[in-house]
Amino acid sequence: MLELDIQRATDAAAPDDAAFRRWCELALRQRTADSEMTIRLVDEAEGRELNHTYRHKDYATNVLSFPADVPDDLLDIPLLGDLVICVAVVEREAAEQGKSLEAHWAHLVMHGCLHLLGYDHIEDEEAEEMEGLERELLAELGHPDPYADDETDTITH
């Protein structure tokens, strides 16, 4: 079971809680243990500050993933980690890339969840595996391949 805390730190329009739950549960279905995670929706100022603090990049990015990195058996809390999503960046990217807003939201939430599970895209082989999973998950929701029209990785972090 997924315990999901959604923190809306911005008044900007964003998907409803049910959509976030659906996307997270789909991305996390390979994890058999209970999971607890937080999604914090932020404005560009907070997104920029967090990206600068944790990644030394002076701009707001679409999604930041903070895995808990705590073994499940160490605590009685199945803490998976946190996602921070900058609403304005998601909206801007969807428009610039000609993607539906819902598909882009789904992609970024599931991308972040995969990071919480330990997937990464630093090395080419890792990126291929992670992007393949993202394509499969999005296809299950009826969304197109997020990388089809892009020669480079659309995830900015």
Curated annotation (Swiss-Prot):
Its EC number is 3.1.-.-. Keywords: Cytoplasm, Endonuclease, Hydrolase, Metal-binding, Nuclease, Ribosome biogenesis, rRNA processing, Zinc. Binds 1 zinc ion. The keyword Nuclease applies. Coiled coil: none annotated. The keyword Metal-binding applies. One of its GO terms (cellular component) is cytoplasm. InterPro entries: MetalPrtase_cat_dom_sf_prd (IPR023091), YbeY (IPR002036), YbeY_CS (IPR020549). One of its GO terms (biological process) is rRNA processing. It is found in: Cytoplasm. Its main location: cytoplasm. Its cofactor is Zn(2+). SUPFAM superfamilies: Metalloproteases ('zincins'), catalytic domain. It comes from the Bacteria. GO terms for molecular function: metalloendopeptidase activity; RNA endonuclease activity; zinc ion binding. Zn(2+) binds at residues 111, 115, 121. Pfam families: YbeY (PF02130). PANTHER family: ENDORIBONUCLEASE YBEY, CHLOROPLASTIC. Belongs to the endoribonuclease YbeY family. Single strand-specific metallo-endoribonuclease involved in late-stage 70S ribosome quality control and in maturation of the 3' terminus of the 16S rRNA. This is Endoribonuclease YbeY. It comes from Pseudomonas putida (strain GB-1). The gene is ybeY.
